[in-house]
Amino acid sequence: GLHLHENLALSFSLAQDFLEMRETGRKCVLDASLNGMGRVPGNLCMELIMDYMNKNYEKKYDINQVLDAIQEHILPIRQQESWGYSTEYFLSAKHNLHRNYAEYLQKKGTLTSRDMNQILKMIPEKKKAAFDAETAEKLYRKYENRKVDDGGVLSQLAEEFGGRRAVVLAPGKSLEEGWKKVRSYIRKEGAIPVSANFYFDEQEGGYAFFSNARRYEEYKTSRKQRSNVILTSNVSGEYGFGDLVINYDRLAYGEKSYSANCGILLLRLLGLLGVKEVALAGFDGYEEGKENYLAGYFGEVYGACAGDNRQIARWLTEIREQMKLTFLTPSRYEEEMR
């Protein structure tokens, strides 16, 4: 018998080869599922192989009943939990790895496919067959902690930010809803606005801060001319002229804990620059079943959950020991901090 996965988008082709090479007259089992349903990246599509066997092996499978079953029972499930070919699982197959490695890195939500390819190439031969979370995490952090000489950049930013207030703009829906209030605060206080992992069209001056390679790549095309960008060193690719790069590990490893959350990294950077008061806008937090981001935001988080609110609130509480934090828009993090 034969059971196939769709890692390399070859299951239908391999099934045809299997049928041709089997011994004539010998019974065999060819495993398939409706619409290729199966844990990502999915399996051989039953409707495809049935149709192929009807045409080439004189079978009489009723495809219409299969299509009806897919329409009624399978497609609603696929809308909630998708499957099928993806670049991440192609990379797992390419490097002959357990597919959980790709899933683990994908859930980080910070890596481009190019980044994932580089990390997966580093997995030792003896660790390939069985997934090892500790190995994956070590390689992920090693890759993210690429070093740059950021002393001059920190001095430049400290000169600009020192003694001033900053406003951190996160992509929650409340940012748009409360923008008049936020803009009024920025103008009144002479604060420097800094967006976190996105560009906000209404923002005037200030900076865009990116610690997520995927977000940076996705927003490259919408970058405004002469916009000021701060990147952490884990963000690969071509930097724009004048972009400022800060060592990732300088921000990810706080005094008490590790965090890859962009808003937290940005606040830690502002602390290093001598900023004593920061206002937060668009820090909505996560709520199950709700639209948690601005319309058109590219960065919806894979695997986000309400438990993240508590963790981020703990990080914010740590940061509040060093600087004053003011929420300009409603936030579930603020509720958790009370």
Where are these regions (language model features)?
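Catalytic cores and adjacent flexible loops of soluble metabolic enzymes
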Residues: G1-G151
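Metal-ion/cofactor- or nucleotide/acyl-coenzyme-handling active-site neighborhoods
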Residues: V148-R338
